Amino acid sequence: MAVFLPVLSQAQLVKMPMDVAPDGTTYEQVSGKSFKVNGTLVPYCVPGAKGKAWRLDGYSSYLQAQIDPTVLTDKKQLTFSLWVAPESYPMMKLDQDGEWFTTMLGNVKLDDNNTLSGDKGGFAFQLGSRGSYKFICHVNKWQVKCEPKAKLSRYQWNHLVATVDGVNKKVTLYNNGELVASKNCVKGEITPGGSTLYVGKSYVEDKVDVFYLNTYNGLLDDFEIYDGIRTDILKEKAENAPVLTYSPERYAGDILRPSFHGMPTAGWTNETHGATYYNGKYHVFFQKNPNGPYMSRLNWGHIVSDNLYKWEEDPTAVSPEEAYDKKGCWSGCVFTDDELTGGKPNIFYTAVDYGRATIAQAQPADDDLLTWTKKAGNPVINGRPNGLTDDFRDCFVFRNGTDLYMIVGSSKNGVGVTTLHKYDKSTKTWSNDGKLFFSGSNRNQDGTFWEMPNVTKIGDKWLFTATPLNTGVGVRTLYWTGSINADGTFAPDSRTPKTVEMAGFSKDGYGLLSPTIFQKDGKTLMLGIVPDKLAGSENYKMGYAHTYSLPREISLDSKGNLIQKPFSGLAAMRSETSFMMTDFDLTAEKDLDPVQGRSLELSAKFVVGNGDFGFSFLGNGDKKVTLTYQPNSGMLSLDMSGINRIFNDGVFGGVYNYALPTPVAMGEEMTLKVFVDHSIIDIFVNDTYAASVRVFPRDVDAVKATAFAKNGSVKMTSLEAYVLDETRVASGISSAVSEAETNVVYGSKGFVNYNLASPNCTLYIYDLVGRCVKAQQISDTTGKVQVANQGLLLVKIVDNKQKVVGQYKVIV
């Protein structure tokens, strides 16, 4: 295939625009040679500093190209130019204290320790694991390093220009037009080096599992070499701001990636610590490895939403860049308090430095919470108190009356505990005397270490949650209810904990873990991590690891039991592709067509009789996932064992069972709600019990959804199903209101009649399978709309701001 080259500067010796085609092809314009990049996913490009820029993922993306070193031969003056915008610094080593370097671009064969392999010669722009950067070149085979004092800026373009002057014996390095380093060199010719150009990775093969450690994470754009000293290019400005998040189009062919569950656009995530609502947005902070879908050197990631189902990723909030947190910025909380934080959200996190864990604090520099500054004088708690027998991490701050406290997860005598630290308002310091907030009773029940402790006041009770390690059934999240004593300690109503998830759905680290809990508009909301539990090789291919549960509205009943139901705002995702029936007998299996796919909501009220009933979804032929309630045993079962899937749950074998504490009596209603989002299922039973489960169906045609009854018919009070669309801000019928409850909208023969408080609305009229049979704008407050359909219809009223102001059930 012919490559049509642009007209180049006469002094230009090498030009690589970094515009990579979907098939992985890129090229060097002067020679016309093309090359193929490496990477697990289709190459991703965005508008760059000049044209298109290549987005490297930090664990699989790199290029080994070829240049002709003879074009650099006999040169005494050269100018090298490269545009870079890193998201993070390269991983390099998993658990070692130090800084190691990789090659962003160059032809020098240097290993992680900058040891030269082969003949002395060549050049390289290098980046270190702690943000140091340098330019290396050779003049008369003498190596010269230009090493700026400052770190390379993340999330912005750095235009790196290096001039090598063997006539005037000077090497200089500029960043965005500013001189950042210079070195003297010997007089003579520049040593060109080898023909292999390493882009995004040095020549060595550093891996953990299947993931490269010495790869660059971020944007690379035009690389150029000019004959002579070209200071005029220092004035060049980037054409576009760098965009380091990935758009949904990157995963357009991915049938497994969730679409309305929170998660970063790439990389590895874990605990959702610190959900909050601030300045008109929901914010969720979380553990993130931006360098790939594996766990190491953790940052605080940040996603935002208007509605808790459509998410956008912001830059990382806190990263391991200080001496006290250089190993990682681990979990903690976000806390807002007029006295402690000046009314703005502050981050409290576990800072780890390869020797110990401390507690540090960070403050926002703007009202959008985009930029954070670590508090001067960090850490605020300088290590674990005496008397503990294990680690010290995952802080949580709360107020009780006039007192401010912090609790931190730990262990004492082999059982999980939380330490208690009181804030001294006069000295503005935290106590650290070894006092305990609450302790477990025994290892089998309470585990050996408590991660992610959280305490929230709900009504007149306090809810305490923790995620213990090494219980008798492994890792799962537990809760207690009780009160806070005058000294800040916790007094549980019972020493015996209860499980947040339906017990048979959560053990050994499956299900929702380590929840974050926050309050907004009188609601207490909770969401947590739901791990993939996949092999690293699967995450390598996908480009991401783990997701979060749907937000749940929680409360406590009179006995201190946790009550969980889906966040009411999720109804706004419902599209017009829907199914709805009321008051009928369900026999055998009922197809919910036109509702099918991988983004679904299924909801029904079953009247309990003798026969089993439930839903099936992700179905194709006789292979399907089923959720079944068995009235005779009171058992709820989720069975995915028969579908073609990526196997991830050896302890369950694809079958999850939960015996309801109190089986639903014969003749009473049972409500089942299921949200399906590609590889995660959120289940709610009677708006009381809940579980989140991962499933990874391989079959692209596994989209069918049904409701079913076995061993006889089941009376149905209602059956609803919706295709969900996370891009919607207002959508299909979210509930049906009977005519007896309102006379604003009512039916008569051939007409839907209305008597409205405000004019200038649109009436949408649907049949029971969700088809819009009429849409009519109305400018008055009283009138009627003629319809051809008869029977039960659903009416939605939308005002001129596209807000749903009423939804009704009428008979025509």
Task: Describe every region a protein language model picked out.
Residues V7-L8, S734-V812:
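C-terminal outer-membrane/trafficking sorting elements
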Residues A11-Q12, T172, L219-A252, T727-A730:
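Extended recognition patches within non-cytosolic domains
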Residues L13-V14, V20-T26, V30-S31, A49, ...:
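Extracellular glycan-recognition modules
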Residues A85-E99, D585-R645:
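Secretory/extracellular carbohydrate-interaction modules
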Residues F135-H159, R645-T671:
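Short, aromatic/His-centered strand-loop micro-motif at the edge of beta-sheets
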Residues Q156-K170, E668-I681:
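Localized edge beta-strand/strand-to-loop motifs within extracellular or lumenal beta-rich domains
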Residues K183-L219, V693-S718:
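Flexible glycan-contacting loops in extracellular carbohydrate-active proteins
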Residues I233-D394, R399-Q445, K457-D508, V530-F579, ...:
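Beta-rich carbohydrate-recognition and catalytic domains
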